[in-house]
Amino acid sequence: MNVENQDPNIMVIPNNNLGPIDGNNISPAMNDENSNNGSSFLKNLVNTGTNLLFSSSSSIASPPNLGGLSNDSTNNNSNSNNTIDSSKPLSFENDMSDGYEALVRRSEIAIDQCKELLDFFKKRASEEEKYSKNISNMFSKFKVKDDHDTFQKGVSLLNKINDAESTIHRSFSQNITTNLYHPLNEAIKDMEKSRKRLLEDGKKLKNDLKDSIENVKKSNQKYEKLCREMEQAKLELIEEGNDTKSGKVETLEKKLEKTKLASIKAEDEYKEQINETNEFISGVYQNRLSENLREFQQFELTRLEIMKSNIRNYIGFMKDIPQALQCEIDSTKGFVDIIDPEVDLQNYIMNNSNPKKVLLPFIFEAYNDHKPFVDQHNQNSSSSSSTNALNYASPMSASGSITNTITSQSGSTIISNGASQPIEIPSPQPISEQQQIPPQQQQQQQQAQVPPTSINQSSSPPVNPMGRQQSLKENIFGFFNKATTNLKSSTSSLLTKDGNSTTSSNTSTSNSNQLSKSGIGLPIINTNSIFGVELEVLIENDNSKKKGNGVELEVPLILTQFVQALLKLESFKMDGVFVSLPSHFNIQQEKQKLDQTGTLENITDVYLIASLFKNWIGDLPNPLISYAIYQEIIEAPDNAWKIIESGIPILHRRVLHYIIDFLVDFVNCSKMDTHSISLIFTPVLIRSPFNGDSLLNSKKEVAVIENMIIDSLETKRGNYILKRNLPIIPDDENSDDDDDDSGHIDDENNSSTSGENDINTTNINNNNNVNSNNDTNNNNNNSNTTTTNNNNNNDSNNSNSTNNNNNNNNNNTNNDDNESNNSGYGVSSNGNNINSSVGGSVTHHFLYQTTPTNNVTPVLSDFFDTNSSNGSSKANTNTHNLGVRNSSNISFDTISTNQSDSEPVLVEYDNDDFDILSYK
């Protein structure tokens, strides 16, 4: 476009973004360069307005020269802002370099700092309150019990000081809460409201500036558009100007005139909008922004003053604490002298004085003087096996306590049994040579004078009738020599209930009658007592209650009741049945009830029964594993059973075997392992006689019990496999051994019949891939038979029948002597105990019988089937060939329960494991 042909009325927009804008120098753009310059101007204008809002107050005070403002004034203001007058105080309005956005961030951080201080005051007040209560509670329960005790008065002085200190800290806590926490909390709320209002005002001011700049932009765009339309109409008119005859020229002229008027109007509007924006920035915007900055500055000053005041007050409260405490301590200094140790000692001696007593000296008494305590049957018996053993199964008294004999200075004998007052028996006067009494009469007189005392199986010394000097271990704890001969004799004397045993019992009864006639009183013992009672007393009381049944218990009745209850309640399915303990009060209450009733019928809590079971074992006066073998057994835990067989009385062995076998089955059927069950039962089964070594030997004690359980577990597993898979080889002349080369028994009919006075041997046959029908019949005129049939589903028909006859384990008998089989007790008939000659030990076997009341009854029976008519037993089984352990073995092999009045069902399992506690 030629400049010469340009319309003088059209103005050109100057190519400067922030230069002055007026109507004299505005002209429409005639090319692309001018159009781009116009767009660049609008962009710079918007950016400038945005920077104005977030720039410093000095920049806002000197905005760009958008109209009417000269460049010189702008430069002067800029130079003045770069120089700060140090003589004047700085302010947010004039000297803030970060602007409005920095103030917003600072106010947010300031509120957070106030909240942190508020939280500190709250926690400190809470801690002071707790400390005050703890101090006051230290001596809150202390009361002066003796007004004459000066030391107690001194302690009360400490209580007074603590109360004073507690009051001081309580006051400090209240001051923090009342004078610091609550006022600061209200101030923070007010500051948050003020900050919110300031932020809203700043946001509104920013929006107003943005709207004003947006209006300038719109008016500029409208103005440029109309200018371009006018230029276009002018070009079209020039092109058509050569053709004067055409009517189009007139139309173009009218269009040009119209666009010219519109562009002039848009130009006026554009100038007016620029003036309004400049006035807003320099007037309203500047004033409102300055006011907002001043309020922010006042907000910060107020906040800092509040923080300073609270910190000063807190320090002042802290200074008051030691001063107040020092005053309290100074006021009580003189009261410390009230404590007079000499006066306290004199008052105590005066109130507890008693005359001086001199103890009588002890006098030695020879060991032979204890011979009157020995059973008369053991002195007069002609059998060497009977004279070398002491019958522990028939205790001579019901007390079951340790008997000590001391000779007083007057020559009388004092017998103390631990359960009653000492009994003093006058000693016989010296007899002259002319008045000598025959030895037999002397013996009778001595028996009449000496009361029948209980021979403690684990602590009192048994007497050697042959006069042999025994070792210290035997004399103190009353155990036999480990020699095989003596152990055989003791076992024979205990298990054979013959005429000699009756004589011993009669002798004990006669001695008791003589003692009653002599006027010497014995302590009255509750026959239902269970806890803290010797095993001998328990078994004697149980047998006396069942005296009319003609049977004697092998273990205490309460032990079988504990096991029955635990099995019936399925304790092996419970978690932590022996670990979870009821409250101590409940245990003590149930122990008192049991001592009165003697039965567990009303207890259904399996955890309570388990706790009572452990308490009963632990309360035994003498532990099951005696003190006599303690050191020996903890040094050799692998030989625990061997040491026990020759080291503790037979009744203790029976009970120990019974408990260990129960634990074996419990471990096998529960989730508990042998080590865990050993840790639980070790403290009640074995006790250290030395208090100092109890902790040092605890691991050794656990190892002993664990080895015993493992040995019983392995023995039981071996016995079960032998009973299931191996034939028992009889040594009877009438028996036939028909084994073929393959190890199977292929006889079509293999039967073995013995007489009434012989023990029948049970043949257990493996019927795998064999066509046979093996029947073993044991004839006994006094019992019926119980049949257990195991049928294997093979290609052939196999039938194994094992008929076992035992007078003790039969529920289908018609004899009156076996009424106890329906009573739920563990019994053994007289004359039917096995006397084993292997290693001097006895092998027992506990089976389970059921009654119509769903009781599971352990019955002590022979490990192998026996049949005896005259009290003597003959074993037809070679235990060496079977590899059976030579020890007393009690097991829970077969368990059955009767859910109705029908016959009991014996359960036998085909897996390799043994004895599964199950109910069918």
UniProtKB/Swiss-Prot annotation:
The record marks 579 as: Arginine finger. GO terms for molecular function: GTPase activator activity; microtubule binding. Residues 450-468 have a biased composition (Polar residues). It comes from the Eukaryota. Residues 65-87, 403-449, 490-513, 757-836 have a biased composition (Low complexity). GO terms for biological process: actin filament polymerization; contractile vacuole discharge; contractile vacuole organization; exocytosis; hypotonic response; negative regulation of filopodium assembly; phototaxis; response to differentiation-inducing factor 1. InterPro entries: AH/BAR_dom_sf, F_BAR, FCH_dom, Rho_GTPase_activation_prot, RhoGAP_dom. Residues 184-276 form a coiled coil. Disruption phenotype: Show a strong cytoskeletal phenotype. mgp1-/mgp2- cells have a severe fruiting defect, an overabundance of filopodia and slug motility and function are affected. They empty their contractile vacuoles less efficiently than normal and consequently they have three times the usual number. Residues 533-716 form the Rho-GAP domain. Residues 90-344 form the F-BAR domain. The keyword Cell division does not apply. Residues 730-741 have a biased composition (Acidic residues). It is found in: Cytoplasm; Contractile vacuole. One of its GO terms (cellular component) is cytosol. This is GTPase activating protein homolog 1. It comes from Dictyostelium discoideum (Social amoeba).
